[in-house]
Swiss-Prot record:
It catalyses: cytidine(34) in elongator tRNA(Met) + acetate + ATP = N(4)-acetylcytidine(34) in elongator tRNA(Met) + AMP + diphosphate. Keywords: ATP-binding, Cytoplasm, Ligase, Nucleotide-binding, RNA-binding, tRNA processing, tRNA-binding. The keyword S-adenosyl-L-methionine does not apply. GO terms for cellular component: cytoplasm. GO terms for molecular function: ATP binding; ligase activity, forming carbon-nitrogen bonds; tRNA binding. It holds the Pfam family HIGH_NTase1. Belongs to the TmcAL family. GO terms for biological process: tRNA modification. Coiled coil: none annotated. This is tRNA(Met) cytidine acetate ligase. It is an enzyme of class 6 (ligase).
Amino acid sequence: MTITGIIAEFNPFHNGHKYLLDQAEGLKIVAMSGNFMQRGEPAIVDKWTRAQMALENGADLVVELPFLVSVQAADFFGQGAVDILDRLGIDSLVFGTEEVLDYQKIADLYTEKGAEMEKFVKNLPDSLSYPQKTQAMWKEFAGLDFSGNTPNHVLALAYAKAVAGRNIKLHPIQRQGAGYHSVNKDVDFASATALRQHQKDQDFLERFMPSVALFEQASKVIWEDYFPLLRYQILSNPDLTTIYQVNQEMAVRIKEAIKTAQSVEELVELVTTKRYTKARVRRLLTYILMQARESDLPEAIHVLGFTEKGRQHLKSLKGQVSLVSRIGKEPWDAMTQKADQIYQLGKPSIAEQNFGRVPIRIETN
């Protein structure tokens, strides 16, 4: 049987995600971000709610990406997620993308020329942002052009790099309907961005979300809910360079900007430069919010939920892979658990995220 991996945020889960799961074959394993997203923002609803949405709509097993995999630039996000899925025995990776492209060929190219390609990136001027460097590399070696806003395509290339040299086949699914950042309401499939923006529009949600009741019952948060705490973390820390990935230049810019910024968005605008993209700045602010330090990734994989089919697969992995299904006195990953505690500060109604929580079980699919 095919074992298909899917790397996702489901922020929130919508019909486009359901379409992706419907297109996937065999046993479907989702490696999902926890409570903070790849582009450096809190999830609109918590990880347990999003895992349940996925399990109700075709996923067989949902595992959590640790915080320091979840909140990373595309390449590190892709690498960390593929590492986890590889250990869970996937033989194919399904993903949505805006481009029609032979990603397998790109993975093969990277297998062959990876060292040369990385050397090319290293030699590019530092005035370029990391995404610009990566795009220059793909243009040079694979002849790829980057048109407009295609974040899923950028992630797909990161997945192609991550599966290089592994026995995992890539299966791109053409993205349906609205683009990633689109807020258009007149489409067959709405984007997660549009759903976040129109979260109070009942008809809109019902049209584009399969598990709408779960979404409506859940506590919702936005970045601004954490701004007072972020402000405190910046002002009270005498040396921001002790925080993960924050360099001297960024530390100075952030300290200066916080004097006048009245919101997270304003802070991001003030700190962003040509070299430091908005997504990168948001990630740095997320690290500051957590007081994140460089730390090792957990050995074990945290299971958020499964169907009967998923449970059988976990059983078959016993003894080969270290799995955590209940977090007790011993932490699974201290950094992720700290992030969860801070996430809960966004709204008093958010449920406990770790202690006493056990995987969600869905009997039928």
